[in-house]
């Protein structure tokens, strides 16, 4: 009938190419899950007592901090920027929050978390102001503030160390708090917080106008500006949110380790970038998901904690592994992602075979 749409068989007959159901982002996430599964199988053969509840709990607790930082980094990278100061922000917020809690033992947990996130947000706003309104490349700005924030912490600490004995008991027990226990596997509160934060932000990116603006600015800043989008405010907000999430990660870092020195958070900037990029976030901006960043964080912490348990591999290879993962992820994004996106945006091919004419009969 003339008023009905062509069915699948008719579309194939007309030469229309059927589109796959999986978007490139979903395909990358499924590939990451496969790599994680293979990694677990390989290390289970190399390491005794590898598949244990205690190791699972250790990986997920460590992953929670990396995942929150990866989410922070992802939001900035989506706007075609990068924040290399997140490790220093973690160090500053962890130390200052610990210092405050040591002097004010009765501080409620919500207020302590808010203090850490507020400090991080202020530091992120400083980064964002210089990038968005000062027009200074983000890699230059955050390399500078990485050193500035760390130097301030060293000067402020004056060789003092925050110890677990000086902190409130609720904070020391926070990483061990369990939401659900399944045999020897504990779903701890710190992991739950990280997952809730990431899922909430992913929903905001996918369903709110703010999320569409973030992707638009990262995809083509000039076009977004011509369309009337407040590109400076969007960039500033991305850095502020990155700082606030880094502050949350600083609080989690403080609760996990208890003992905080001026070296707290060093190296986390590399881990956050690696988790985001390995998770499928394009380093060129405008593409990627927080779910992918979460899986990237899981893979990175799994590899790091697994490699430590293999005696033949030196622990100093950790950064080399992260660097290799970043290079492989970027190469894969350019090689595979480009072809997949071209496939999605290219017009369907028409069949070269001419359509058959219906037979006609003379009256």
Model segments located where?
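Hydrophobic alpha-helical segments embedded in the membrane of multi-pass proteins
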Residues: 63-73, 88, 92, 125, ...
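Single transmembrane alpha-helix segments in multi-pass membrane proteins
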Residues: 37-105, 129-136, 276-290, 324
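Transmembrane alpha-helical segments in multi-pass inner-membrane proteins
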Residues: 240, 246, 256-323
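Helix-loop-helix "hairpin" substructures at the membrane interface of multi-pass membrane proteins
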Residues: 108-116, 122-127, 131, 182-261
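Cytosolic-side transmembrane-helix boundaries in multi-pass membrane proteins
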Residues: 1-41, 226-233, 303-363
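Short loop segments and helix-boundary regions at transmembrane helix junctions
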Residues: 21-24, 77-82, 103-104, 121-164, ...
């Amino acid at each position: 009938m003339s008023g009905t749409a062509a069915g699948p068989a008719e579309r194939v007959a007309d030469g229309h190419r059927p589109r796959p159901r999986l978007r490139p982002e979903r395909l990358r996430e499924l590939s990451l899950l496969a790599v994680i599964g293979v990694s677990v199988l390989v290390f289970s053969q190399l390491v005794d007592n590898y598949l244990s509840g205690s190791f699972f709990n250790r990986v997920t607790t460590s992953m929670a901090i990396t995942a929150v930082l990866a989410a922070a980094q992802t939001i900035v990278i989506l706007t075609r920027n990068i924040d290399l100061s997140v490790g220093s922000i973690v160090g500053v917020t962890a130390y200052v929050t610990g210092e405050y809690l040591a002097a004010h033992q009765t501080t409620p947990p919500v207020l302590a978390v808010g203090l850490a996130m507020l400090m991080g947000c202020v530091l992120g706003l400083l980064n964002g102001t210089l990038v968005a309104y000062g027009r200074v490349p983000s890699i230059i700005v955050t390399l500078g503030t990485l050193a500035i924030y760390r130097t301030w912490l060293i000067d402020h600490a004056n060789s003092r160390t925050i110890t677990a004995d000086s902190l409130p008991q609720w904070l020391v027990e926070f990483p061990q708090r369990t939401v659900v226990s399944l045999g020897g596997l504990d779903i701890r509160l710190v992991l739950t917080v990280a997952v809730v934060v990431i899922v909430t932000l992913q929903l905001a990116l996918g369903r709110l106008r703010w999320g569409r603006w973030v992707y638009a600015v990262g995809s083509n800043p000039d076009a977004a500006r011509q369309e009337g989008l407040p590109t400076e405010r969007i960039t500033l907000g991305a850095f502020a949110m990155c700082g606030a999430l880094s502050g949350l990660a600083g609080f989690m870092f403080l609760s996990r380790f208890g003992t905080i020195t001026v070296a707290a958070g060093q190296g986390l900037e590399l881990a956050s970038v690696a988790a985001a990029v390995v998770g499928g976030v394009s380093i060129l901006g405008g593409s990627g998901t927080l779910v992918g960043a979460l899986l990237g964080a899981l893979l990175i912490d799994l590899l790091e904690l697994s490699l430590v348990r293999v005696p033949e591999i030196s622990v100093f290879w950790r950064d080399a592994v992260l660097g290799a993962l970043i290079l492989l992820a970027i190469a894969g994004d350019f090689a595979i992602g480009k072809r997949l996106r071209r496939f999605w945006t290219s017009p369907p091919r028409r069949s070269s075979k001419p359509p058959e004419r219906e037979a006609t009969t003379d009256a």
